[in-house]
Every structure is written in C-alpha cells, then in structure tokens.
Amino acid sequence: CILGEVDPENKKAVEGMKHFCTVPAVINADKVIVQSEDMRRIYVNVMTEETAKNETPEKQKEIRKYWENKIDGSGSPKVDKVLRTRKEDLDIPEEWLRVIRKPDGSRKKIIFYNTSVSALLQHGEKVLEKLRDVLRIFRENQEEAALLWRPHPLIKATIESMRPGLWEEYEKLVEQYREEGWGIYDDTADVDRAIVLCDAYYGDHSSLVRLCREKGKPVMVQNVEVVGTDAE
C-alpha cells in the first residue's frame, strides 16, 4: 500500500495510520522499507511507543535504536518502478493507439480516469450519475483528449455481491462505453502502464494519486457532488 505523505508532527494524521505501523509483517520482518524519511520517523515513533512504554528510559533507548536500524526510509519499490519506466518502454495495444492518435499522426492528451470501489459503495447512484457526466464530457471532447478509464479491479466482485442493483446499472455504463469505442477501457493488471502513458490523472482519491504526482503528472480528484458542468 502506498500512503499519502503524513507530517510526523500531525498527531491526528499519525493516529489515523498507526494500524499500518503495527501489522505483524512490520514486527516479524528483518527489514522494513517505507516510502520516505518522514514515514520512517512515524514508524519508529509508533513502534517504539508500542513496544517500550513500560520499560526503563535506558531500555527505551535500546528499543528505539532497534526500530531505527530495522526501518529504512529509502522509498517504495512501486514508486521506484514507475519512476524508472519511460513511455518509450511501454507496449501499447493497437486498439489504444487508434484512440490516442489524431488524424495528423500526433497524439491527443491522455487522461487517466481512475474509479474506486469505496466511492461506489459510499455514494452509490451519485457515482453512476457522475460517471455518465464524465463520459459525456470526454465523448464531446474526444478529438483533443483520449480517456483512459481504469476502474479498480475489485469493483466487479465487490459491487456485484454487496450492491447487485447498483452493479447492473454500472455494468450497462461500462458495456456502452466499450461498445462506442471512442475511449480506452483498461482492465489489465498493469497499472504502471496507465500512469506512465497518461498526461494527467482524474478520478477518485487513491494510492495512485501519489504515484502520479511522483511521476510529475497533474492530478485532479473528482467530486461526485458536481455534475452537469465541464469543470469542477
């Protein structure tokens, strides 16, 4: 999991992510690599507090030293992989290229549209209304921008079982979008390709936001409450 950066001095934010620090994998691993030095400070502070609270000051220092040696803030392998990958290295399907290329051979701006499971569960019909509106706007502007819609891979399994009525409507939207063929629908396992290929990110808040920002892509998080306008 890639977390948004948290200020080690922000007690409320640290409290909200403590459960990531205390999972068995962190306790049992020989080495733990986290995404930044700030994140390392948080892990060290949390784990020292959790494991040394009833110890003497001298013992607390030893325990802190143990966590400082164990936790490495050198970065996320996921981020590193995305940063190393160039557009020229990508294998882009021909059907995608047909959407991306303009008649003169130049490329349209590619917008990575990411939709999440949590937004659908939380907002239900509002998300469907938002989806229809987003697809309408990109359909109308398809000569200049190519939409690369990549829903979270667990949407089908989760929504179909928990909200079957919502799933039926959602599935109709997906089928219509794919049949019309003016945009890209990415249901592959390769999320890195979408991040590297795109010119900007739009959609729900997720761990992919940080990856896109690290890659230097502009990011806009959608507001499901705003519908019927070309801008948010």
Residue map of PLM features:
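Active-site and donor-binding regions of nucleotide-sugar-utilizing enzymes
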Residues: 1-83
